[in-house]
Regions:
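Generic hydrophobic, amphipathic alpha-helix propensity
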Residues: 14-22, 39, 64-68, 72, ...
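Amphipathic alpha-helical linker/stalk segments
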Residues: 66-91
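Amphipathic C-terminal alpha-helical segment
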Residues: 100-103, 139, 150, 157-177, ...
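Amphipathic alpha-helical segments that line or abut small-molecule/effector binding pockets
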Residues: 66, 87-102, 154, 158, ...
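Helix-turn-helix
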Residues: 17, 21-59
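Amphipathic alpha-helical segments used for helix-helix packing
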Residues: 102-121, 169
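Amphipathic alpha-helical packing segments from all-alpha helical-bundle domains
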Residues: 70-73, 120-145, 154-158, 181
Length: 194
């Protein structure tokens, strides 16, 4: 078992602080409008100190967007593994995505606005993970309704994401639980009515 040294923990903590600062600022202003010095100041370090942890501002964006795409895919795979029943699997996917959308509205904003600012290799990595995530939903929907066509299931999955990912635009910061109930009910209704 490997344990982090005190210095290793500090470095990991600083890296997390820099990512959190970058996430907040990029969500507020957009990637292009944020300077490396702004991120450093928000994290309590000088701009150049960031280079000890990341090669540049672009690397922060890569870590944010590739990171969330990878986490979403892994989470959905885990939901399926834990829920062999098709109905429970779909409910689990809805709850999992709701957890993400309510906890990470800044990442949704960044994804919507700044994906094009990623280097092409990172964009491909994000898109590949997103396609696999969509296919998990398509599979879950078709397992629940074997008569459902693949294209229709894909449209339904994307519609569900549109509803669930509306949180940065529709949710007041003080009402995540109210929003959860409404978004869950609307998503279930939308997926059930097709």
């Amino acid at each position: 078992v490997t344990t982090l040294t005190s210095r290793g923990r500090q470095k990991s903590d600083r890296r997390s602080q820099l990512l959190a600062a970058a996430e907040k600022l990029i969500a507020e202003r957009g990637f292009v409008a944020v300077r490396i010095e702004d991120i450093g100041a928000a994290a309590g370090v000088s701009g150049p100190a960031i280079y000890r942890h990341f090669p540049g501002k672009e690397a922060l964006l890569v870590e944010l967007l590739v990171g969330i795409s990878t986490r979403l895919l892994a989470g959905a795979q885990s939901v399926l593994a834990d829920n062999p029943d098709p109905g429970a699997a779909l409910d689990g996917l809805i709850e999992f995505h709701l957890d993400f959308a309510l906890a990470e509205p800044d990442l949704i904003r960044i994804q919507d606005r700044d994906l094009a600012n990623l280097p092409s290799a990172a964009q491909r990595q994000v898109r590949r993970a997103q396609r696999r995530y969509v296919e998990i939903w398509v599979g879950a929907l078709r397992e629940l309704d074997p008569l459902l066509g693949e294209d229709q299931a894909r449209v339904m999955a994307h519609a569900a994401f549109g509803l669930l990912n509306s949180t940065p635009h529709s949710m007041k910061p003080t009402s995540p639980e109210d929003s959860r109930g409404v978004l869950r009910a609307m998503t279930i209704a939308a997926l059930s009515s097709a």
